Design a protein with these regions (language model features):
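Short, charged alpha-helical segments
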Residues: 13-16, 127, 131
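Short, Lys/Arg-enriched, Trp-marked, Pro/Gly-tolerant hinge/linker segments that flank
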Residues: 3-71, 84-92, 96
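Terminal helix-turn-helix DNA-binding modules in bacterial transcription factors
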Residues: 52-66, 73, 84-125, 129, ...
Length: 149
């Protein structure tokens, strides 16, 4: 009876209970490992995640904070690392992807230009037209007409 209440058994009980709690937390939330030295790098996998996110959400207002959150980096580190990896800023990449998607829609659909502008995330048809012309060298209407000719 004395052995059950000794300080040694009490300490052993607390340690066992604590280990049990930690084990349950790790099973539920996953093991946490220390960050590797290149934790701030924009790996190929992280770059793919950002690319998929941008392409899947072109119609959304894609902020630098949103893109950085996709890969778990601060917006400062994300922006810097993204430009190092791709040669363009995240904003330039989003615009490039919007124009690329618009070209596809102009080629493959008969949707009105205003609808295409909205579908790929431009705030207005005039903004879409200016940006498209700057990147492609023709307005969306002329691009579509030339493609169909």
């Amino acid at each position: 009876r004395m052995a059950a209440t000794s300080p040694h058994n009490d300490r052993l009980y607390r340690e066992t209970a604590l280990q049990s709690i930690v084990a349950r937390l790790l099973r539920k939330h996953g093991a946490v490992s220390p960050s590797p030295p290149d934790a701030g790098a924009l790996s190929q996998g992280r770059l793919r995640r950002v690319t998929r996110h941008v392409r899947g959400h072109l119609d959304a207002n894609l902020s630098l904070d949103d893109l950085a959150d996709v890969v778990g980096l601060s917006k400062y580190h994300f922006s810097r690392r993204f430009k190092e990896r791709t040669g363009q800023s995240p904003y330039q990449f989003v615009i490039y992807e919007r124009v690329r998607a618009a070209r596809h829609l102009l080629q493959e659909t008969t949707r009105p230009l205003a609808q295409i502008a909205f579908d790929v995330g431009f705030s207005s048809q005039s903004h879409f037209t200016r940006t498209f012309k700057r990147h492609v060298g023709a307005t969306p209407g002329r691009y579509r007409a030339a493609w169909r000719a």
